[in-house]
Each structure stands twice: as structure tokens, then as C-alpha cells.
Amino acid sequence: EWNVVAINKNNEPITHIFVTSKGYGNGESGLGSEQKTSTLRHFFQEIPAGGYVTVEPMLPELFHLYNEYWVSYFIGNQIYDKKFIFVPDSIVEENLIEITPLGLQGILHE
């Protein structure tokens, strides 16, 4: 089972976290018609310093697509945005590493 997890690596909490996710691409062979998933939106009030929250499950049926996560959050009164894109077929066991805050193996995108 694969999950998308937001990890706060800051020394202070982040608040008002808004995550938008979507998948898109040209099919498994790269030659097919355009494919895209629904756009999903998630909100989290706070992630404490060094904490994490599970955003959503990631389905293996979507690994052949670009999987994009756009994260907006506040530290104090300052807003930040980050975009994370998992390229097609990058979510594979060969790319697993130890993710210390979770105590699990996974694929870390920074």
C-alpha cells in the first residue's frame, strides 16, 4: 500500500496546509490518448514541527502517469508554495529509501 505523506521538516509548525493533487499523461505506452485524473483537494489545519500527515493513498494504477502535488502552507504570516511531481514509473521498489520520520521505507520527494 502506498500513501502520500506531507512531512514538516521545519523547526516550527506549518499551518493552513492546502494540497492539490492530480495525475496526467499519455497512457501506459506513452502513445495512447491523454489521460488525467480528477483533481483532489485536501486541507490540514496544522502539522507540528517534525510531524507528518497522510494526505491520500496513491494507487498503483496511476504510477504510469505524472502525479503532481501542489502544497501551500503558512509559517507564521508567510505563505509558501511547493510543487512535487512524481514522473511516470518512478514509484518502484528500486527507488525506496528509509524515511526516518515515518520509520518506513518510501520514495522521498524534496
Give, region by region, the residue ranges found by the protein language model.
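Short, flexible beta-strand-to-coil junctions
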Residues: K9, Y24, I75-N77
